């Protein structure tokens, strides 16, 4: 229920923002095929992980993407859940479409993550551990030109190195989507 309220608040903020606010945040940093509409955005991400997401543009087509949240993983009868922190460096090489209402940039990047989790076997808590991982996110961002919002869809390839009771590596494919409000 709280999640619905959060989405409703973000929607009301977006609808209450004028076109002048959106135009004020527009900028161009050169002749790139994709030019970011804002510098710093903050929002919600759902999927793997679920939590807060932020994006900070270093130039018109390069950004830092970061987040904090929880992630839930199930492998046969075992499951892991816990705190997830990540940081990615993103490239936005091109936009699939540029029209007056929105841009649709493709992005790819690389980064890392820390995952502090509890491990469960059946109904019993088995142990806790952590993983350090390398990430390669691929995604699309629906970057609206007239309101300071973007909606993103992302697939991330992850290689985790697990530490604690069992040292090993694992490969994952994770998906998420979310919405961000741009402050400038």
What are these regions (language model features)?
Residues 50, 68-69, 75-76, 124, ...:
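Outer-membrane beta-barrel domain signature
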Residues 145-184:
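Predominantly the C-terminal beta-signal and adjacent terminal strand-loop region
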């Amino acid at each position: 229920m709280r999640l619905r309220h959060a989405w409703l608040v973000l929607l009301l903020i977006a609808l209450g923002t004028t076109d002048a606010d959106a135009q004020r945040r527009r900028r161009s940093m050169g002749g790139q095929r994709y030019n970011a509409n804002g510098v710093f955005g903050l929002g919600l991400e759902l999927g793997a992980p679920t939590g807060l997401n932020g994006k900070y543009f270093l130039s018109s087509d390069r950004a830092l993407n970061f987040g904090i949240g929880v992630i839930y993983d199930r492998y046969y009868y075992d499951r892991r859940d816990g705190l997830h922190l990540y940081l990615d460096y993103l490239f936005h090489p091109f936009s699939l479409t540029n029209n007056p209402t929105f841009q649709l940039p493709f992005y790819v990047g690389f980064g890392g993550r820390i995952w502090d989790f509890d491990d469960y076997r059946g109904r019993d808590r088995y142990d806790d551990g952590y993983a350090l991982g390398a990430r390669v996110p691929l995604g699309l961002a629906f970057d609206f030109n007239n309101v300071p919002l973007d909606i993103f869809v992302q697939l991330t390839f992850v290689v985790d190195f697990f530490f604690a009771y069992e040292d090993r590596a694992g490969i994952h494919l994770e998906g998420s989507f979310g919405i961000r409000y741009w402050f400038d």
